Amino acid sequence: QMIHTSPQLLRNSRTLQQAIQGTFDVEIDVEYTHIGELVDRIDDKVLDNYFRNVWQGEMKKYKYSGLALIDEINGLKPRKVLDIGCGYHEFKGKIDNIVGIDPYNDAADIHVKLLDHHPDEKYDATIALGSINFGSTDKIYAELEHAVSLCNPGAVMFFRANPGLPHDKSESNWIYFYPWDS
């Protein structure tokens, strides 16, 4: 919307960079070949800032978090478990054979976005607790399809959608939380 209302911003990279920093409180390279590339870069940086600096895990808040999920997954005796958007990787050391991926948190085993994760082996169990919630319907479907493609036949997926509760941090104002209830 900022660019739509002030298209002259695109003509001056310094002014554009200042406008982006002033609006989103992030610094990015503003060189781009198409506007979608710039928008994606802003989105990535806003998410990175939110999940690195603002968001804190709430392991005990939901049914499929914490000890109940740990016991359930370990009871399956999976050879390999994927934790998508593992955050602080709180399941590491508690669930056998777990691999945590997260593009924004240094605790992850692999720093990668879900759609860019292409392991050599598939998983017997997958956890996605509030991590497939950001972006358009097309992006959500693509992420869900990719998560399923990473699983062996008969694998189990534990999934939790964004509960639809407002996020009280101002840094979340620019993040699109997928409306699962609509």
Residue spans for each PLM region:
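Class I (Rossmann-like) S-adenosyl-L-methionine-dependent methyltransferase catalytic domain
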Residues: 1-117, 158-182
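Surface-exposed alpha-helical segments enriched in charged/polar residues
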Residues: 71-74, 145-149
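N-terminal hydrophobic or amphipathic segments with adjacent small-residue motifs
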Residues: 79-81, 124, 148
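A short acidic, Gly/Pro-enriched loop at the edge of an enzyme's catalytic core
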Residues: 115-126
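Active-site micro-motifs of SAM-dependent methyltransferase domains
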Residues: 116, 133-134
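A short beta-strand submotif of the Rossmann-like class I SAM-dependent methyltransferase core
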Residues: 128-131
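Short glycine-dipeptide loop
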Residues: 151-157
